[in-house]
C-alpha cells in the first residue's frame, strides 16, 4: 500500500504571515455594510455576513453550466479588500476608478502575505469578479445584488416597516438575468409586496 503524501509545512515566517492574513480577513466580521448604516438599520450585518450567505447561495445553485466551486470562491473573495479599505458605498460618491484602485492596492497588500500560488489564485479571483470576465463572475455579481435585497426585506420585517428600504430594490431594477435568480427575486418581491399591501390596509391606531 502506498503511503500518503506528507502534509506540506510552512516556515515560521510563513505561519506568521498567514496569521496576519487571517487577522486582516477577520476584520470583515467587524466592518458593517455601509448602506445599512446610512439608512439607520439597527445592528447592521457585516461584510463577512454578506459574503457568507452569497457563498451559500452559490453552493446551492442548480445551474450545471456553471463551475459551482469557482462561484463559491468568487463569493468569498469578491469583497475581501474591504477588510483594509472598508465598505465603499455609492452614497460615498467615490469614483468607480478610485474605488477600484484602492481595492486593487488592498488585494495586493493582503495576498502578499500568502504563498505565491495562493497570491495568484486569490488576486485572480478578485480580478475576475471586478472585470466580470466569466459566466461565474456575472452570476456571482447577480447573487451580490440578490442577497442585498433579501437582506433589505429581512430588515423591513424585523423593523415591521414594510417598504422602508425601497431604494435598495430600485437600485437593482433590470440587473437580474440569470433564470434561477430571476425566479428567486420574483418570489421575494411577491412576498414583500403582499406585506406592503397588508400594512397599507391595516387601520391606523
From Swiss-Prot:
SUPFAM superfamilies reported for this sequence = HD-domain/PDEase-like
Report the co-factor binding details: Binds 2 divalent metal cations. Shows activity with Mn(2+), Co(2+) and Mg(2+) but shows no activity with Zn(2+).
Q: Which reaction does it catalyse?
A: a 2'-deoxyribonucleoside 5'-phosphate + H2O = a 2'-deoxyribonucleoside + phosphate
Q: Does the keyword rRNA processing apply?
A: no
Top-level class of the enzyme under EC nomenclature: hydrolase
Residue sites binding a divalent metal cation 1 per the record: 50, 78-79, 144
- Provide the positions where the record notes the PTM N-acetylalanine: 2
Q: Which keywords does the record carry?
A: Acetylation, Cobalt, Hydrolase, Magnesium, Manganese, Metal-binding, Phosphoprotein
Cite the binding residues for a divalent metal cation 2.
82, 87-88
The family annotation for this protein states: Belongs to the HDDC2 family.
Q: What is this protein called?
A: 5'-deoxynucleotidase HDDC2
Q: Which organism is it from?
A: Bos taurus (Bovine)
Cite the source lineage. Answer: Eukaryota, Metazoa, Chordata, Craniata, Vertebrata
Gene that encodes the chain: HDDC2
